[in-house]
Amino acid sequence: MEYIPQVKQANILCCMCGVLIPANPSNMCVDCIKSQVDITEGIPKQLTIQWCRGCARYLQPPNHWAIAELESRELLTICIKRIKGLNKVKLVDAGWVWTEPHSKRLKVKLTIQKEVFTSAILQQIFIIEFIVQGQQCDKCQKFEAKDTWNSVVQLRQKVDHKRTFLYIEQLILKHNAHSQTLNIKEKPDGLDFFFSNRNHAMKFVEFISAITPVKTKKSEQLISSDEQNNAANYKYTFSVEIVPLSKDDIVCLPPKIAHQLGNMGPLVVVTKVSNLIHFIDPNTLHTGEISALTFWNSPFRALSSYKQLVEFTVLDVNLTGATRGRYALSDIQLMRSADFGANDNIYDIRSHLGNILNPGDLALGYDVASSNFPDSDLAGMKKNQQLPDFVLVKKTYPSKNDFRFKRHWYFKEIPKEGIENPKKFEIDQMERDREEFLREIEADPELRSKINIYKEADAANILQQRIKKMQEHGIDEDAIKEELALDGLLDDMVNNLTINDEEFEDEEDQEGEDDDEEYDDEDEDDDMME
């Protein structure tokens, strides 16, 4: 018979109180260990946390403000990060202890562990109280304070429409270029962007210069000065003028520019305005482009813009064989759509839209023969040259929104102050410009690729009803195919991106402060030179 010895647990007396306990390396009972060692030593039991009443955000040091609901995981993370001394212990658990919402108190229950003696680990539960203190964040301070701007960018364009600003506004939103603005005001001929420091304004001007041809002029106004310390306080104004040209305008090139572009034109169509201005000669398919510097050295203006566009009906198209990209040279027979039933005037013209137009299509163009142009605008015309009677610029479709049916997509707009006491014709003009911009988005895939377009809440159902309504009204099949597909639209996820955007803005703020110091040093050097 095999004997199995039974191992009995050794018991000892606690060296402090004499209670019989199982043997352990400390030779002390749990109560005595707790009385002798406090593992929460060095961890504060009461802290403060800053909360902005205006935007309901909490301060996460050093300068980041985060949105968090009461008793949420996000707020718990912010509170734990404020506790010093947790790196010396092991955090096992953390949770909330309920408090009255109006008490301005937050209580967090923590469970921690720490090795107190050799191989002896002590666990303890305790509560830390956070006192909520009110403090305005930087954004709310800027919003509440008046006349705190340091720099203003005055964006202007001398044209009779605002389609360019609608497009630029979408690019600003897509790239978040307006994140550092204090305020944005709408003006009759443009927009004003206000900034807290000059560096942010200069970055914004650089962004505008990268997307459209502009001319910039800087001025400054002395606000105060300290002669003893050789310091001064200025307000800066950046006047940014956009070239007075838009897509589908027709222009007469000055002789100097026409010569630089290989003697093209001189009557040409503006096909694109980005950081360069692109032209095409509708009679030869000759293309060219000029920079903002070239334009402002020899400025010129459009002979006609989209308000003078006339609708034509294409009767016949004969391709000549010459092509360039998506354009093809052709002889087109057409008549004014308004002349149907009134007269039988038919015109033969040459156009660059040969592979876009088919017999029966509608096209928009300019009635050059019936227009009166100043002699200064036709300075590029030679004596042996004649203006064409008509110039076509693009294909069009019957209006799809005469029945005022809702679109299944939308684009966002920058929050800004509108024009004070606008007149009725200004409101009507803005609505027409907006509708024209919406139609350009529908018809131009390249334009859609550059901006963010979002789905409506019930986009699929709206699109289905819209197409059905268009079919009932006899809209052309090609126009129906132009309707934006749902897979090309974005979901509105702005709420999920808020915190990340704020982190980016805080980084920009820090960079702006550093760069401002560099600019201030440069100004001091300039003053010394003077």
UniProtKB/Swiss-Prot annotation:
* GO cellular component term, pick one: cytosol
Q: Which key words tag this protein in UniProt?
A: Cytoplasm, Nucleus, Protein transport, Transport
Q: Where is the composition biased (Acidic residues)?
A: 500-530
Region of interest called Disordered, as start-end residue ranges on this chain: 497-530
GO biological process, any = protein transport
What GO molecular function terms would the record report?
ribosomal large subunit binding
Name where it's found: Cytoplasm; Nucleus, Nucleoplasm
Q: Which InterPro entries match?
A: Nmd3, Nmd3_N, NMD3_OB, NMD_SH3
UniProt keyword Phosphoprotein present: no
Function noted in UniProt: Acts as an adapter for the xpo1-mediated export of the 60S ribosomal subunit.
Q: Which family does it belong to?
A: Belongs to the NMD3 family.
Assembly and partners? Associates with the 60S ribosomal subunit.
Write down what this protein is called.
Answer: 60S ribosomal export protein NMD3
Organism, as annotated: Dictyostelium discoideum (Social amoeba)
Give the gene name: nmd3
